[in-house]
Amino acid sequence: MQQGIPVELSPSKVQEHIAAGEKFCMIDVREPWEFQTAAIAGSNLVPMGSVPNRLQELEAQADQSPLLVICHHGVRSLNVVQWLRHQGLENCTSLIGGIDQWSRDIDATVPRY
């Protein structure tokens, strides 16, 4: 992905990047029960409350590929991305509309709740 990754990306833009062979490290910041209800294949659960304690881990992952931060509707993920950027981790973006929008636009097999 180019330098200057946007703060937010739409599901269709994420899909375009993936189709072009680009990789994301997908970080789901929802609660465990939400993750069990619906998840994007390949995403990793890092509940929002645990993000500060896992900052070094997230920085290491962001060195490998951009972090795509996911939540239910895109609010928590945007807050996490803004916090990460404030900590100096710029290689991250929030999924606009969250997993709900992903289910509607990209993969209808992901349950909506």
Residues of each region from the PLM?
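Short, surface-exposed ligand- or partner-binding patches at beta-edge/loop junctions that are enriched
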Residues: 70
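Rhodanese-like catalytic fold shared by cysteine-dependent sulfurtransferases
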Residues: 1-25, 32-66, 75-113
